[in-house]
A protein has these predicted regions:
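C-terminal structural segments of small proteins and small subunits
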Residues: 56-89
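Compact, glycine-rich, soluble single-domain proteins
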Residues: 7, 11-58
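Intrinsic-disorder/low-complexity, polar/charged segments enriched in Ser/Thr/Lys/Arg/Asp/Glu/Gln
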Residues: 1-5, 60
Length: 89
């Protein structure tokens, strides 16, 4: 299992479009990917759960990945978050 803190860096936080990109990324992998914010944990492969986290810019989220391709899955999620979900602002 890989567990690490990541900081949401994009201006609008984990809004619908960013959540959809995260779901698309998570679904490429077999591993279980979960995000935790403020004592609430959700499956990264479900958009509604991600949106309900309410993670805003500069909020810290915990990412937990477990499974056969956990290293690749974590790196993909980390890159997406660090690249501000490919948003311009």
């Amino acid at each position: 299992m890989i567990q690490k803190h990541l900081t949401i860096q994009n201006k609008l936080g984990l809004h619908t479009r960013a959540a959809a990109k995260l779901v698309d990324t998570a679904k490429k992998f077999q591993s279980k990917i979960e995000l935790t914010h403020r004592d609430r944990t959700v499956d990264a492969k479900g958009i509604m759960g991600l949106i309900t986290l309410g993670a805003q810019k500069d909020n810290v989220i915990d990412v937990m990945v477990s499974g056969e391709d956990e290293a690749e899955a974590f790196l993909a999620v980390e890159k997406l978050v660090n690249d501000k979900f490919h948003e311009k602002e």
